[in-house]
């Protein structure tokens, strides 16, 4: 029995906090091979990606040109994968570039609009190229979302609070948006109005989805990624909470996504769809 070729992986955002964790995880995975690393921070240009990540040399330099690195992922026997943890401003173009090169994107960068995701889905399907957009790679968060969907069948009042580090660029988080979307799929409207509300300070009640779910965003140093889904009814409060205390907790989900995306020919949104 011949051993299958490892999956070529490009990490975009290689010098970021999540990018470093991905480099460590991919370097240790027997069925994967790090072939490229990209980061726009000039401080790390030419540095060994493994040294920057803190896992020792991997003989892959960090470059600042995504397209030239994507070419490296197309030169192997197996279709390559790009893992993207960059910035909301550039992620849409990153995904389109990867698909255009036949490299399958696994995207943890949040901030994409619904219209952008729809457009990328059409682009990926036309190219018969798999793409995974995952707001949260934590298995624990997926379990929380599933529990929230079950609870929402019995509660009419719900609000979401998401708490992240103060370097996060988008709000609310992709995870909170995804959670609200999952609750909305039941086809019910939440939080029927009992009183006419007045905000003394604009935005005090958070953002509101079309289904009337309030989402509140907290940005403070010390947090990594946390979320509460709070249900209320007469005489009771039901709270679901998930806390990420170390980014390494995302890596089993990232590695699973890398393996699964090689089998896809279209875009899938959400880790729960491949579990």
Curated annotation (Swiss-Prot):
GO MF term set: 4-hydroxy-tetrahydrodipicolinate reductase; NAD binding; NADP binding; oxidoreductase activity, acting on CH or CH2 groups, NAD or NADP as acceptor
Catalytic residues as annotated in Swiss-Prot or TrEMBL: 164, 168
Principal subcellular localisation of the protein: cytoplasm
A Gene Ontology BP annotation from the UniProt entry: diaminopimelate biosynthetic process
Organism placement in taxonomy: Bacteria, Bacillati, Cyanobacteriota, Cyanophyceae, Oscillatoriophycideae
Subcellular location: Cytoplasm
Identification of the protein by name: 4-hydroxy-tetrahydrodipicolinate reductase
InterPro entries: DapB_C (IPR022663), DapB_N (IPR000846), DapB_N_CS (IPR022664), DHDPR_bac (IPR023940), NAD(P)-bd_dom_sf (IPR036291)
Keyword GTP-binding: no
Biological or metabolic pathway of the protein: Amino-acid biosynthesis; L-lysine biosynthesis via DAP pathway; (S)-tetrahydrodipicolinate from L-aspartate: step 4/4
EC code(s) of this entry: 1.17.1.8
CDD domains linked: DHDPR_N (cd02274)
GO-annotated cellular components: cytosol
Pfam families listed in its UniProt record: DapB_C, DapB_N
Keyword RNA-binding: no
HAMAP family on file: DapB (MF_00102)
Binding site for NAD(+): 13-18, 108-110, 134-137
Keywords: Amino-acid biosynthesis, Cytoplasm, Diaminopimelate biosynthesis, Lysine biosynthesis, NAD, NADP, Oxidoreductase
Matching NCBIfam families: dapB
